[in-house]
């Protein structure tokens, strides 16, 4: 099969067009796809690719400068705490004076993964689960299986409207329980309920909400979200002043990126 990338994007270079191209390119591992690529006024050319499974790590880390460590969690998977522990041990050798934890666009994932991630920062209450009956149950952080030195330096958490569910649990818990936590960005999504799915005799299903999640200080998450301590919109017209993270790319001729939320975080901890 073939995908004329040049024609599709030339007709409408939009998010919808990019999604359309992506859908056409995807397929079973081992199969091939031919792409027609156009560059400027040059004659388009064909490239045949063999499809393969792409594994995107849920955690990435780096030093942004000599003193600030950056961690991005894109999703809370089963192995996320283990990978994060590896990253934090590696970063600790460089003695960071602050951490920036980026959960922008993180849709959530496994609750026990979030509890174990919190266990890398502190021991204690991770969240409360409030049943429909009003009964509240305390859920604790999950300690790492190996010896681990929890950090004691400031943490800035970056959030936006795509920060949801388990990532909101982590954000709220760090603000409530980890000293010197500051939340920067825009209001999070506000998804914090537990639902059971029951099958119906007609083949349908019904979702029944049985509980909601509360932060350690018993603040609701669902329908409310996490309101940042410092509200910073992602302004496309901002100056390019910070290292490029979270798949951001610099503009032509530049090496830094426009990311006012990260710039604010660095201003707080530098």
Which stretches of residues belong to each language-model region?
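Short acidic, Pro/Gly- and aromatic-enriched capping/linker segments at domain boundaries
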Residues: 202-212
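Conserved functional hotspot residues or short segments at active or partner-binding sites
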Residues: 219-270
């Amino acid at each position: 099969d073939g995908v004329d990338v040049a024609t599709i994007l030339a007709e409408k270079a939009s998010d919808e067009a990019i999604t359309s191209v992506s859908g056409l390119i995807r397929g079973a591992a081992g199969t091939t796809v031919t792409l027609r690529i156009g560059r400027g006024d040059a004659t388009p050319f064909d490239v045949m690719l063999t499809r393969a499974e792409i594994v995107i790590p849920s955690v990435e880390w780096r030093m942004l400068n000599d003193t600030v460590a950056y961690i991005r969690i894109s999703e809370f998977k089963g192995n996320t705490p283990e990978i994060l522990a590896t990253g934090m041990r590696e970063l600790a050798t460089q003695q960071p004076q602050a951490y920036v934890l980026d959960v922008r666009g993180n849709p959530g994932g496994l609750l026990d993964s979030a509890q174990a991630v919190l266990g890398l920062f502190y021991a204690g209450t991770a969240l409360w689960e409030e049943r429909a009956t009003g009964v509240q149950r305390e859920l604790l952080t999950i300690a790492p299986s190996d010896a681990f030195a929890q950090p004691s330096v400031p943490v800035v958490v970056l959030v936006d409207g795509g920060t949801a569910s388990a990532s909101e649990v982590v954000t709220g818990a760090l603000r409530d329980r980890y000293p010197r936590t500051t939340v920067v960005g825009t209001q999070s999504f506000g998804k914090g309920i537990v639902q059971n799915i029951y099958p119906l005799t007609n083949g349908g299903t019904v979702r029944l909400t049985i509980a909601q999640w509360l932060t350690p200080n018993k603040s609701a998450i669902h329908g409310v979200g996490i309101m940042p301590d410092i509200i910073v919109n992602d302004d496309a017209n901002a100056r390019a002043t910070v290292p490029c993270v979270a798949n951001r790319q610099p503009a032509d001729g530049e090496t830094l990126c426009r990311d006012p939320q990260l710039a604010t975080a660095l201003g707080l901890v530098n």
